[in-house]
Regions:
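Catalytic-loop of the protein kinase fold
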Residues: 156-180
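Regulatory extensions appended to serine/threonine kinase catalytic cores
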Residues: 315-438, 442-457, 464, 468
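Short beta-strand micro-motifs within the conserved protein kinase catalytic domain, predominantly
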Residues: 103-114
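Juxta-kinase regulatory segment immediately upstream of eukaryotic protein kinase catalytic domains
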Residues: 2-40
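Terminal C-lobe "cap" of eukaryotic-type protein kinase domains
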Residues: 294-295, 301-317
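AlphaC helix of the eukaryotic protein kinase fold
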Residues: 78-95
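AlphaC helix of the protein kinase catalytic domain
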Residues: 126-136
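ATP-binding glycine-rich loop module of kinase domains
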Residues: 61-83
Length: 603
């Protein structure tokens, strides 16, 4: 396998600093410390990193008066044209005057480094709140929808002098909305995809003067790519920018928060109508997420026109029975939480190849992500399923999942250990969404994923010749917990799924032999070898379930590490073992059944 083909195996470096090479992690920490030091020298206190994305890093600091500010730094490794976008963002932010939008303060350029300074939005972003709470309550969603509707109205009615000059945010999603639950204030942040709209909601060109209408640019788009998990079809396909883009972002956001997902793609299988929302509100959201443009636009118009009336409906909290997880998981309370990363294999069968969509030149960070994360030739439900697996990895959880689609049924095997009992309800919502999305997939095949702690990842560096550099070999750690023999029916085998067509790394036979021996000992775990030209990464977790076998178990783990230094090939290969056969069977289901908020909640 050539070095170039390694890009087929995508374990996102952004997921954890622990997956960076020692050199890159050191550079990353140094750079963050330089930024913090610079801000401290300018007199700001309590400087902290509060976010990072494809284009830059975001820090917060407090000045002596107590005012809280945000500083957005562009990544200096990006092309100048991309770095210039931070200045564009600063300009667009300076044009907006709305209580839901943080106040612009200044833009500075220090050598190659652009820095945008603005007021800090109070509260926590809705993606984080969603991960902690699970599905948001109908009352909170309707309240949020009204606030977002008001912002959309303000943006589309914006004027430059006497002329209409609508603004498009272009990247509305849960992580770009900050909610201060004490004051119930929402803030719409991150204006990096914002542009002036080229066409209005009716598809007519917007022009502040006759020269704009005569311009040749009227046929080409000025739109910027927002988050590919939330933007609508028109923005994704490069249509001219329109206020309709933000209607799509709002619908995607409400839908994701209502369903405990991190994307818009699941609406065909888990429609808003199945999420316990008020009937009128649910139908509007489903309409806005429709595949038909006429339906979408009509629903968007209805949303803008009728949201104030919908928000007046009395929506008290109703006591619902606690949701039961469709597949079991264990919880333990630990102070040192895992930094979870997911590795998925056997994704190929989810793809629907479209050779007209071959990517030749990716120069957009979001598009790059779209292609790398297997989204460009999969159906919406498959995209939603893969996104739901990624969402599970946002929890402090280790374990494995195996989904097997057969003619009439879906079979799921699992071993999941959640390391924070306080997240049990939210994690249940995320797990159940994953299973429901899997029920909606029609292709027959097998999908496996491992969730491991990146803090435990072992990295062996290589020199220019490919030889490994180490003073002494590290050890594979494991935990021990005893499971009664009566609980074991037929242990899951490392080998029962056969060879994975997605994995190209040829492992030495001695490692395979060790894994074969390990397979005879009752345990759960996974080990993934990710072989790169400059280093070998070993991602793993192990839990021994038969304490009497500990001597043999630890000896085999030592042998595996000794034989890893004979890996010469490039690529990824891995093994996963679930603790015992506890297969759950589900019927395939193309759409979850309708469930609205009750007409009379007092009954």
């Amino acid at each position: 396998v050539s070095k170039q083909s390694i890009h087929n195996f995508y374990i996102n470096e952004q997921q954890s600093i622990y997956l960076l090479s020692h050199h890159d992690a050191k550079k990353h920490r140094q750079w963050l410390n330089i930024c913090k030091k610079q801000l401290s020298l300018l007199g700001y206190q309590d400087v902290e990193l509060i976010g990072s994305g494809a284009f830059g890093f975001v820090f917060a600091g407090v000045e002596e008066s107590g005012a809280q500010w945000v500083f957005k730094f562009s990544r200096i490794t990006l092309a100048q044209s991309v770095r210039d976008r931070l200045e564009d963002e600063a300009y667009m932010l300076s044009q907006i005057n709305n209580p839901m939008v943080p106040e612009f303060f200044a833009f500075e350029r220090v050598k190659k480094q652009g820095i945008l300074m603005m007021a800090r939005a109070k509260g926590e972003d809705l993606e984080q709140i969603s991960l902690k709470q699970g599905r948001l309550k109908p009352r909170d969603l309707v309240n949020l929808a009204l606030k977002l509707r008001n912002v959309l109205l303000d943006l589309r009615e914006r004027k430059n002098g006497m002329s209409l000059q609508p603004v498009v945010h272009g990247d509305i999603k849960p992580s770009n909305i900050v909610w201060d639950q004490q004051s119930d204030a929402f803030s719409l942040v991150d204006w990096g995809s914002s542009v002036y709209a080229q066409i209005d909601v009716h598809g007519e060109p917007v022009a502040s003067n006759i020269m704009d209408l005569m311009s040749s640019d009227i046929a080409s788009t000025n739109a910027r790519m927002g988050d590919v998990y939330f933007i609508g079809d028109e923005q994704m396909s490069g249509a001219r920018s329109s206020p309709r883009f933000d209607e799509q972002g709002v619908a995607s956001t409400i839908y994701a928060l209502a369903s405990a997902q991190s994307c818009r793609f699941g609406a065909q299988v888990i429609p808003a109508a199945s999420l316990g929302l008020p009937i009128e509100f649910a139908r509007v959201i489903d309409g806005m997420l429709s595949k038909d443009k006429v339906t979408r636009d009509a629903a968007g118009d209805y949303f803008i026109r009728n949201m104030p009336a919908m928000a007046k409906v009395y929506l008290p909290d109703i006591s619902l029975p606690q949701a039961k997880p469709y597949i079991p998981f264990w919880t333990v309370q630990q102070t040192d939480l895992p930094d979870t990363v997911v590795y998925s294999s056997r994704k190929q069968f989810l793809r629907r190849a479209d050779h007209n969509q071959q990517l030749l030149d990716v120069n957009d960070a979001q598009l790059d992500r779209y292609y790398k994360e297997f989204l460009f030739d999969t159906g919406d439900t498959e995209k939603a399923f893969l996104a739901s697996i990624s969402r599970l990895a946002k929890y402090p959880v280790v374990g494995g999942l195996s989904f097997h689609w057969q003619q009439e049924s879906l079979f799921v095997e699992s071993s999941l250990m959640l390391h924070d009992e306080g997240l049990q309800d939210a994690f249940t919502d995320a797990v159940n969404a994953t299973v429901m999305l899997a029920q909606g997939i029609k292709q027959k095949g097998l999908f496996k994923c491992c969730l491991f702690d990146a803090r435990q990842t072992i990295q062996l560096e290589r020199d220019e010749t490919g030889a490994y550099i180490f003073e002494q070999l590290p050890e594979l750690n494991y935990s021990v917990s005893h499971v009664a023999a009566s609980e074991v029916t037929r242990p899951h085998s490392y080998f029962e799924d056969g060879k994975d067509p997605d994995e190209q790394l040829q492992l030495p036979k001695k490692i395979i032999q060790c894994v074969f021996e390990l397979n005879k000992i009752h345990h759960t775990g996974c080990i993934i070898f990710e072989s790169l030209s400059d280093r070998l990464k070993i991602h793993y977790y192990y839990r021994l379930l038969d304490a009497e076998q500990e001597i043999a178990f630890s000896a085999l783990l030592r042998e595996i590490i000794q034989y890893t230094v004979s890996i010469q090939d490039y690529g990824v290969a891995g093994f996963m073992k679930l603790p015992y056969k506890n297969t759950r069977e589900f019927e395939l289901c193309t759409t979850q059944q309708v469930q609205y908020y009750p007409k009379n909640p007092k009954c």
